[in-house]
């Protein structure tokens, strides 16, 4: 419900941003009962280190609209209406296929992704300005 929305103040390199979070009490993890708001507040708290580790890279967003026990999907393209602080870079694959890919450069963009029901962020091993030149080795260890 729209009346249930909250607005979080998220510090960042361009100053504070206000990020609206709808359905803040939606339970994302049934055990131990973590809500969408708690996940967003966590990302506000760890915003600096999160951006240091994942920022300035194309990222795929793994979204769970009904929590982790519900259906999930991956989102790469920034949706229409994304705020101006959510960046994108045009990526091209060896096949020649190309599309815009989300790039998170500040904590407010990560909190916005939670608003879009993102639970897992999958950053590329390369930076947005050189998508064909990985500068990290990343190993994805899934618990299930």
Question: Language-model features: where?
Answer:
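Short glycine-/aliphatic-rich beta-strand segments at the starts of folded cytosolic domains
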Residues: 133-144
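Active-site loop/lid in soluble adenylation, ligation, and acyl-transfer enzymes
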Residues: 2-135
């Amino acid at each position: 419900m729209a009346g249930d929305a909250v607005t979080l103040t998220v510090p960042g390199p361009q100053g504070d941003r206000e990020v609206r979070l709808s359905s803040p009490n939606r339970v994302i993890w049934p055990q131990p009962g973590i809500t969408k708001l708690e996940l967003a507040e966590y990302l506000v708290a760890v915003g600096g280190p999160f951006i240091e580790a994942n920022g300035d890279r194309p990222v795929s967003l793994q979204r769970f609209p009904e929590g982790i026990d519900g259906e999930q999907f991956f989102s790469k393209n920034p949706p229409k209406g994304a705020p101006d602080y959510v960046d994108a870079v045009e990526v091209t694959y060896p096949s020649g296929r190309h599309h815009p890919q989300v790039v998170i450069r500040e904590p407010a963009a990560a909190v916005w992704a939670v608003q879009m029901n993102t639970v897992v962020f999958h950053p590329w091993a390369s930076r947005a300005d050189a998508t064909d030149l990985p500068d990290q080795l990343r190993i994805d260890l899934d618990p299930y």
